[in-house]
Amino acid sequence: MAHNHNHDHNHEHQHEVITLVDENGNETLFEILLTIDGREEFGKNYVLLIPAGAEEDEQGEIEIQAYSFTENADGTEGDLQPIPEDSDAEWDMIEEVFNSFLDEE
């Protein structure tokens, strides 16, 4: 998912930062762009991430990664899971919330 970032960049964004570790043990820092509560509809939550310090490409877009997660019994956030590409209902909901988020920016 890429998004066209057409708003003023002279203001500061204060995003939480997390580190993701890939299957090879490589760590990558990401900023949390948005979290979505999808528990009522899908039984899980979602998070949209951008690489920390990411710059827009020539088209003014930044690559966004989306994951789902469920809360652990103790209330902490569980492991991030990729969202299945064929889960149209989930992707439609994420896109709708994300577009609303962009409209508010």
Curated annotation (Swiss-Prot):
Transmembrane spans: none
Source superkingdom: Bacteria
One Pfam family linked to the record: DUF1292
InterPro entries (UniProt xref): UPF0473
Family: Belongs to the UPF0473 family.
PANTHER family: UPF0473 PROTEIN CBO2561/CLC_2432 (PTHR40066), UPF0473 PROTEIN CBO2561_CLC_2432 (PTHR40066:SF1)
Protein name as it appears in the record: UPF0473 protein SAK_2028
Organism: Streptococcus agalactiae serotype Ia (strain ATCC 27591 / A909 / CDC SS700)
